[in-house]
């Protein structure tokens, strides 16, 4: 009886642990796209870095995705609606803006401006 109780308890703990895990794997920025259309392309991929060029015409965005650690540079800016763990906000992203991030759990963006935005994203490996 003690053995059966231990097995049942172990099964319950295992089930609870599995239920607490995030079962939804989000795409990275290259995989994400917008409404099943690619918005990023690989411009360099080597053993040390991956560089993406992401282009967002007005009205186009980036479906919910995550980012690993990365550096970004804004080749051409615009205005974006950004939704993430802190809520939704509208942000002006000027041309020439650079940024670094240790990683983003998830976000979704949409170009709500009137000009096409272009970013370079550099991801160390």
List PLM regions with ranges.
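Ligand-binding loop in jelly-roll beta-barrel domains
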Residues: 77, 104-125
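Bacterial N-terminal signal peptides that target proteins for export
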Residues: 1-9
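C-terminal motif of bacterial Sec signal peptides marking the signal peptidase cleavage site
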Residues: 16-19
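Short acidic-glycine-tyrosine-enriched beta hairpin
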Residues: 86-104
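Histidine-centered metal-chelating micro-motifs
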Residues: 59-62, 98-110
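Bacterial signal peptide processing site
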Residues: 21-23
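A short glycine-rich, His/Asp/Glu-containing loop-to-beta-strand
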Residues: 33-61, 68, 72, 122
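Glycine- and acidic-residue-biased ligand/ion/polar-headgroup-sensing regions
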Residues: 67-86
